[in-house]
Amino acid sequence: MTILSDVKALGQQIWLDNLSRSLVQSGELAQMLKQGVCGVTSNPAIFQKAFAGDALYADEVAALKQQDLTPKQRYETMAVADVQAACDVCLAEHESTGGKTGFVSLEVSPELSKDAQGTVEEARRLYAAIGCKNAMIKVPATDAGIDALETLVSDGISVNLTLLFSRVQTLKAYAAYARGIAKRLAAGQSVAHIHVVASFFISRVDGALDTTLPDHLKGKIAIALAKAAYQDWAQYFGSPEFAALETQGANRVQLLWASTGVKNPAYPDTLYVDSLIGAHTVNTVPDATLKAFIDHGTAKATLTEGADEAQAQLAETAALGIDVETLAARLQEDGLKQFEEAFEKLLAPLV
C-alpha cells in the first residue's frame, strides 16, 4: 500500500497519464495498479511518443503497411489494441468498485474538434472497436464536443471531456451531461454504468499567466481556478434538479485535474497533486509526477481549503485586467493545435 491508497480513501482517484505497449507488456502498468493507480489516460501526443520510442510497435507497423489501410486506420488498429490491453489490466479495479474506477481513455481525432456529428460517429465506432466496459472516449470540450457529449451519454457511452480551462464551459458540460442522462431515462434505459470526467487543465494556466503576475500570485491562479471550479461542481451536483436524476441511478460528473506535471522548476514537483485532493475527483499524472508523489507527496484533503483565498486571488487577477475566460479560450485553442500537430507527426511514419 502506498500514499495512493490514502488519496483514494479521501475520495480521489489517481490515474496514469501515459500508455504504451511496453508499459502494459512489461507488467509495469499492473504494478502501478497494485500501488493504487486506478485508471489510464492517453492522447495523440502520448501515442506519438509511444510509437516513436517503443520498439514493440515496429513489427506491427511493418505488417500494417503491407495492408490496404489509411495511416489513420493503421494508427487506430494499434491504439485500440493498446487500450484493450490496458482495459484488461484495469478490469479487476473496475469491477472491485462496481464500475466506478479502472477506466482507460482513447481520444477521437483532433481534426473533429469542431464537428459534433463527426465526433459522435467516431466515438461510437471507437467504443465499439474497443469493446470493453471500462473504456472511455475522450472528446475535446469545444462547443461541438459538448453537443457530442449529450448524444454520447444518451447512447450510454462513458466520456472523458478534455481540454477544459473555463468554468463557464465546464458548467455547460454538466448541463449537456444532465440532458443526455434525462433523454436516456426517458427512453427507459439504464444510466448507472455511465461515467463522465471533466478534464480541467492546471499547469498551463500558470504557465500562461506567471510572466504577467506579481510575485505573490505566481503559481497560485491555476489552483485557485480549480478550487473555484470545484465549488461550482458542488453547487451543480448538490442541486435538487440533479438529485432527481441521481435517484434514478445517474452518477455525478467528476472533475479530473489534468496537466498536473509542474512546468516551472521553481515549484515543488508535487504542487498540482498535493493542492488538489478532494472527494469525487480524479488527478491524472505523468510517470515522473506519480513517482514524485509516491516518494514525497502529502495525502490531505486540500481542495476545499482556502476557498475564500482562492476567490480573492481570482478577483485580484481580474482587477489586473486579466480575463481568465478569454485566457481559457486561447489555451483550449492552443491545446487543440498541439494535439493536431502531434496527430500529424504520429500518422507520418504510418503512410
Swiss-Prot record:
Any one Pfam family match given in the protein's UniProt record, by short name: TAL_FSA
Presence of keyword Kinase: no
Protein keywords: Cytoplasm, Pentose shunt, Schiff base, Transferase
Gene Ontology cellular component annotations, sorted alphabetically: cytoplasm
Keyword flag Transferase: yes
Major enzyme class: transferase
Enzymatic reactions: D-sedoheptulose 7-phosphate + D-glyceraldehyde 3-phosphate = D-erythrose 4-phosphate + beta-D-fructose 6-phosphate
HAMAP family, per the entry: Transaldolase_2
NCBIfam families in UniProt: PRK03343.1, tal_mycobact
Protein name as catalogued: Transaldolase
Species name: Neisseria meningitidis serogroup C / serotype 2a (strain ATCC 700532 / DSM 15464 / FAM18)
